[in-house]
Amino acid sequence: MHLVGYAWLREAMQLSAFPLHLPAIVQPVTRLKKIGQTLAVPSAIAPAADDLLGHVLFALKHEGVNLAILAQALPKIPVAALENALQEAPNGIYIRKACYLREAFTGEEVPQHAPVRGAFVPLFDPKRYVTRPGTRNSRWRVEFNGLGDVSYCATVERTARLIELQEHDILGRAKAFMESLPPVMMDRAINWAYLHETKDSFAIEREAPNEDKSRRFIHLLRQAHERQPLTEEYLVALQNATVSNPYDLAAAFRHEQNHLAGALQGAAGVTYVPPPPELCRELMEHLMQFANEAPNQIDPLVAAGIISFGFVFLHPFMDGNGRLSRFLIHQALCRAGALENGLLLPVSVAMKREERLYLEALQDFSRPTRDFWDVQWIDFGKLAFDFRGDAAIYRYWDATDCVIFTMEMAQHALEVELREEAAFLECYDAVYRAVDERFDIRGSDLANLVMMCLTNDGFVSKHRRKQYQYTVPTEVFDYIEQTAQQVLSEKHAAQEKRQ
């Protein structure tokens, strides 16, 4: 048994690439099939062990498109090898793709002895990948239909889970749900969403924003509905509005190396190193172009996941990247026109609840990337960084799991956060109205007691009874409890009936 395709190229050519999720391995089988975490390959169709181009063509045909490996492997294959293969199959789909990519990566032409004929072929199979309208190369009759361009491109595979989430129509259901609410209730639910999206986006960063910082971030969230295109100037303004330390305010994308660190000291504590400054600034141009186009070309939630995680992986600022990356989910959905009437899906609230899964999604990229950096401790607060990898690991990345996580959080934000808050507001109104009609209680006291009772499973605690004993009669406490328990019981019964 031996490796073939991308796994062989990665190992034999010692390429800077992440381990494959499904390496192709020759096994005693009669046809290609998935066995466990490998792609079992019959020896009859396996390329020769030393045939570089053969492994590239095998991979393109049977394993999809891995640009991170192809960008490093194809430039090392002599032009003559591609020229000979092209003569044998002048209109072959996979040799055309290989020639097209090699020219794109190197700028060096592969000679054609006759013009390529036949229909245009998509570089990415639309049945396997999420794709978008592409740019056509008439020389090789190949259409680049990836999620980005040849210099920066994410891939999203159409897995069963992704398809399931898309069929759920999360954004359509969110719109329908909000439209089903009375106007006043809808406004209150939206205001709650903005407030808690702000609070939990900061909480993920282990920060509690003051009132001024919260107000500024809420203003930014509302501003996203203006659909302003992403530019360096706009992102700098956003960063300045979300960072309070004057020494961390950016004037442009970073010109120095940054990193993320854990609890350990020195180099051992460095958990992620983003791309070097020059590469970061280049890739941000491509990401911003994608962000300004893709939300109107593909599923907005798919675009939002790529933009958000792509931004945080590039880390273009020295501080504020995390909360800006979550803001960009909202910005992408607004740009697509998917959130109307000021609607916001509080994805940060969902992410805070699922913080472990959020960290895992980030670490799927950050951990293997860290292996390509040599970090040396110089002094406290001073580290030296030496990138030993290839820029391809930052240029081309698999965003499938990041997109699925983003969609799951959007679904959670709708089905749990927004629906629960709307139900809570409905219960609150019912209890408040019933008590207010029967007793003459100060409005602020009644509002606080109803709120505290509902969040305490229908009971007013001894502490609260004592706190309000001189302004609220005992029978009012009892009636609040009685009414709250009845309203909560009716709500639970209605939920069970719907299920």
Predicted regions and their residues:
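FIC/Doc superfamily catalytic core
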Residues: 1-318, 323-499
